[in-house]
UniProtKB/Swiss-Prot annotation:
Residues 1-29 are annotated as: Disordered. Residues 1-35, 88-107 are cytoplasmic. Its main location: endoplasmic reticulum. It comes from Aspergillus terreus (strain NIH 2624 / FGSC A1156). One of its GO terms (cellular component) is ER to Golgi transport vesicle membrane. This is Vacuolar ATPase assembly integral membrane protein vma21. Residues 1-10 have a biased composition (Basic and acidic residues). Required for the assembly of the V0 complex of the vacuolar ATPase (V-ATPase) in the endoplasmic reticulum. Residues 57-66 are lumenal.
Length: 107
């Protein structure tokens, strides 16, 4: 079945659509805070440079390449766990601040 359409011109439709919607203030805050991006970049640089530095430093001091590779892998995991821990702590701080704000509103 065909649907019935009104005999409205495109100019009338445009006038109705702009007249019905009040102007809204746009939110220009970034979706992700700057300190989060900087923290991610810092840990990314550390994730690349620390294992490589550890590998070449241990190789330069005469360690075998096997032990150098193992130490580089361990350092990569340490940095990964540090990043997870820092993100977890930051999330807890946000939750505590939100809970305090809700408790203040409830009073």
């Amino acid at each position: 079945m065909a649907s019935r359409r009104t005999r409205e011109t495109p100019a009338d439709a445009a006038a109705h659509s702009t007249a019905e919607k009040p102007p809204v203030d746009s939110d220009v805050t970034p979706a992700v805070p700057t300190h989060v991006i900087l923290k991610l970049l810092g840990f990314s640089v550390a994730m690349v440079s620390t294992p490589l530095g550890m590998y070449f430093a241990m190789s330069a001091f005469g360690m075998s390449s096997t032990f150098s590779g193992i130490s580089a892998a361990i350092m990569a995991n340490v940095i990964l766990f540090l990043y997870i821990y820092v993100a977890w702590q930051e999330d807890q701080e946000e939750r505590e601040a939100l809970a305090a704000k809700k408790a203040k509103k409830a009073q």
